[in-house]
Amino acid sequence: MDDLLASIGLTHGTRSSRKGTWTEGARKPVGKKKKLAAETTKVPTPKIDFDFSSLLAKAPAVVHGFSTRSGGVTRVYRPGLPKSQGDLNLGFTSHDERKNVEANRTRMMQALLGKEAKDWKLVTLQQRHTPVVRVLRDTEATHLRGDAVMTDLPHRLLGVMTADCIPVLLYDRKNGAVAAFHAGWRGTLARIVERGVGTMKIEYGTDPKDIVAAIGAGIGPCCYSVGEEVRHEFESQFAYAPELFSDVYESEPIRDKYPLLFMTARAPGHSPIGPQLHLDLWEANRRQLLDAGISAKKISVVGTCTACGTSRYFSHRTEEGFTGRMMSVIGVR
């Protein structure tokens, strides 16, 4: 038997194969060792989504983006998310830990800038719904008070935070200046965007015809109900104010599905419960940009309502104040 086994290259207690020789009972190869795959799998970093302006995206010298709520480490607002997911809260709110916000800001800049992130500084504002416009001249400044900021310094990412208010970004193609605005109804009423364009004229010699503008996601006319006092305020400032307001009746799903059950009900407009007054802040800020001399062809509007889309955006109104903040950013290389 031994002679027979030897004739085919085998002996008692061993087996031959193409990958080496194993001794009977052994688990590891005696010949060339084979690396074993790691038993653990690296969890990928959640994707960070941005909204972008198609117009600003055509300018290679500009970096911009409107953040959404996905891809961060914050879990306080949606604790039911899978452990591998979190919100990208970019504002220092009273609910979230500072370390989470700092980690989220780092992620945001890396996602937007890649390897360039280390060369950039993030400049933010202490926002108070004012018409205050700040000009960044100091290369070391990173936090200012106001609701708009502009600069022509390179590698400065200007950021405004929102959770329903309207973010507006501007780029002067000729002079290489950029600006970011936080426009709630008070800032819009105070013409903060128009003021900003005027400041750019003084600071950089900007011609409005050279400006490209982008209006980001915010609460839309579908959801932004306001009081009559707000309408009166706008009518005192803008001749076109009536075009910014609309009467909206609340949807009644049961009535819509079973109209025959409500045949004896009063027609819309004749019910004791009247319509709600809604304001279109997107259009209000677009009109200000037009009045400032910017061409309609150079104004882009994301047109997505934050109050309707809380799976993608933070909304102060829909989430009753318990929410994070998005950040809209712009800078020049």
Language-model regions, residue ranges each:
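Active-site microenvironment for binding and transforming phosphate-containing groups
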Residues: 1-333
